[in-house]
Every structure is written in C-alpha cells, then in structure tokens.
Amino acid sequence: SLILRAAQRRGLQLADSTLLSYRAEAHGFLAFLAQLGEGVIIPPKVVQTEELALSIAWWQPNRSAQQLVGRRDTTLLPADVGYYRDRYGVILDNLPDRIRLGDGQDVRDVPHPLAPSAMGLYEYQRAEPVRMRIPGREIIVDEVRFRPLNGATPAAIGSVFLDRETAAVVRLSMTFTRAAILDKRIETLVVTLENGLVRERYWLPRRQEVEVSRASPIFDIPVRGIVRGRWEVSNYEVNERIAAVTQALPRWSSVSSDSLKRYQFPGRVIDVLPPEIQIATSEDV
C-alpha cells in the first residue's frame, strides 16, 4: 500500500537518496495572542510577536545544523511571554517516529502515523487524489487520512498527502488525542508541514505552522492564550559542500544577541503577521 511505501521510505530515503546536502534560509514568526471571553464575541489579539531568521544546513548521513541569525520582537501589551526552544527551529524530517513537541511538554513519544512500528496502531483512508503539473511532468498526490484504532491512546489524528510515484510526504497536518496531550490546559494543538519540490526531485520543507491554544480561567472569566508560529523556507542550495565550521555546529544554535539585533529585516515586525490576525492596542488594556 501507499502508506507502507511511505513508512519504508522514511527509513531508506536519507541513506539511498541522491540528495547529499542542502542549505536554505527560513523566515518566520512566533506570536502570542490573548483572548478574554468567548471567541465569537471577542477575537484573540496579538500581545507579543517575534520575527525570526534562521540558516539551515543538512548533509549525509542525516546530520543538520540550524542557527538563529536574526530576531526582533515587539510587546504590544504588558506580558511575560516565553516560548519552548523547539518553536525556534524548522522540522526537517516530517517529524520523527516518536513525536515530541513543546520540548516534550506538550506531547511526547507519540507514534508517528508513518512510523513502521505504528502500522497496527492507526487506520487509514485514502481520499481523492490531487494532480499537480510542472513542465514536462504530472505529479499525482494522494491524501490519506489517519486516526488511531483506539482513541483513548496517545496518538495523532489528521491527514498526509503523498507523492504517488515516490511515496514522499508533500503535506502533513495533525492534531492529537486528549491522551497524547500532556499539558491539560491545552485545548487545541495543530501542526502543519508543507514541502515543496526542489530541483523537480526533492520534497523539502517549504512552509510550517503550529498553533497551540491554552485555557487559563481567571476568576471564572474565560482567558485563552494562543501561540502561533510560521516558517517559510527558501533559497535552497542543493548538493553543495557544507563548510567544516557549519558541520561543527550543534543541531540548533544562535548567534550572539548583538548579532541577532543587527540582522536587517525589511519593514516592521508586525508586517510578517497574517492579515487576519488582530493587533492589540492600548485600548485593550
């Protein structure tokens, strides 16, 4: 089946692929939104946001280094906001066989629906295919929906789009069962990974989004804190030599705080936010 091929590819593609290395750049944001009352009446508004720039390097055998090279933030209302460290990085492997998010505080060790060991834990349903055309070639992408056989166990729920020819992941979107979510304040946790075709051959990270909503009632008043993050990955250089100094870096690191501040972002920090997100003002205090 397509799912079995996709599971097998997870273990083989990095060892057998002609993809030897790549470098890329990522641009994104992290935003903290607050909502008082029910959403229909009072929509969430941005309290604090950070704009981020990241350099990415990957090379065989499945080694990588990500370095935060630019960061600026703005706090629109008084707040003490912090983010888990893994929010500052790009997911390079379509999530590992044992999924861990929020530095293991949101979910930890959840079986990936494409992990070879998880085939007996999920049920799968194929939906209508999507046809994509590039010069001289048509790509057929199949959507496969997945959910756990036992909804009371820690597991993922969502869908994955797979290249029918190669079984590579094109898009993966998932949420989680209540049993999988460790922080019981969390109401929703959604992760979406979109890959793009690089050199008309390699499906590599293109866009990633995460949204986590936590409820924290104050004096019986519904209060919700929402973290939204988005990365856009571009400027790929494939099968070029990775410098030794880069290969010596840890999987994630950051330049100095002074260097982060010197990074030149275009426009304003809030310009990176999607237009549907509302900005908090002094009147909201």
Regions found by a protein language model. Name each.
Residues 166-171, 175:
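Surface-exposed extracellular loop regions of Gram-negative outer-membrane beta-barrel proteins
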Residues 172, 206-208:
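Beta-strand-dense domains in secreted/periplasmic systems and polymorphic toxin scaffolds
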Residues 204-206, 218:
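RNase H-like DDE/DDD metal-dependent nuclease/strand-transfer catalytic core used by mobile genetic elements
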Residues 177-184, 188-194:
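Outer-membrane beta-barrel proteins
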Residues 1-157, 178-182, 212-285:
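Structured extracytoplasmic
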Residues 158-160, 164, 190-200:
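Extended lipid/amphipathic-ligand handling interfaces
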